[in-house]
A protein has these predicted regions:
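Residues forming anionic-ligand binding surfaces in small-molecule and nucleic-acid pockets
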Residues: 1-10, 166-167
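A structural signal for alpha-helix termini and helix-coil/disorder junctions
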Residues: 29-32, 36, 171, 193
Length: 221
């Protein structure tokens, strides 16, 4: 369950500077929401840092070469509290991707104005309730027709060029855009300091899961 959003942009907006400006605005809204939530429920104390740290997936690999991508996220989030990891989907110096991304969605292959590859990323925080990093949003500047063709070729998916969306984009019938998804239940978990998604979202859980959570002091809806 996500709040999915898309915004029309111009060619000049397809930069890392613009991407990071949008990230700042989204993170600012999250901070404001945390403040208002803690104001309404004084037993909750804010823990998110004032600023979000930006780092490219390649830089993260170089910082923690012996760790897995998830372990790298844990380490950098524990250090800074809130992080935007950029360039997710492109291959790094070790020949691997930090994480997978579809070829026809985010632009993870364009070289930005700072020489780094990719115009997308994930908003992550250090979540003390669980003692690990926690993803709140995946987002990015979407592919233009050049990036689309390049990424389809990289992934060996050139046959997808014939699909409706792809043809519309390649024919300049769609606007350039930036977009993403913000996890509703995940954000509610963070705002209310919950450890299990079942504490804020109605769902079906096994008796074993309910008993385990009850023993840990968690009441599932």
């Amino acid at each position: 369950d996500e709040w999915d959003w898309e915004a029309v942009i111009t060619e000049s907006d397809r930069t890392r500077h613009y991407l990071e400006d949008v990230v700042h605005r989204i993170y600012g809204a999250i901070l404001r929401t945390e403040f208002l939530t803690c104001e309404a429920y004084p037993q909750l104390k804010p823990f998110l840092p004032k600023d979000i740290h930006f780092i490219h997936a390649q830089e993260l690999l170089e910082m923690y070469p012996d760790k897995t991508p998830k372990e790298r996220e844990d380490a950098i989030c524990k250090k800074y509290g809130a992080v935007f990891v950029e360039g997710i989907g492109c291959r790094l110096s070790n020949g691997e991707k930090h994480d997978g991304r579809a070829a026809d969605y985010d632009d993870w292959s364009t070289v930005a104005e700072d020489g780094k590859v990719g115009l997308n990323g994930d908003i992550l925080i250090w979540y003390p309730v669980l003692g690990r990093s926690f993803e709140l949003s995946s987002m990015g500047i979407r592919v233009d027709k050049v990036a689309l063709l390049r990424q389809l070729e990289i992934e060996g998916q050139e046959e997808r060029e014939q699909l409706y969306f792809h043809q519309q984009l390649l024919s300049d019938k769609l606007p350039l855009s930036i977009g993403g998804g913000i996890g509703q239940s995940r954000l509610c978990m963070v705002m209310l300091h919950k450890a299990h998604i079942g504490e804020i979202q109605a769902s079906i859980w096994s008796d074993e899961m309910r008993q385990e959570c009850e023993a840990a002091g968690m009441s599932l809806i």
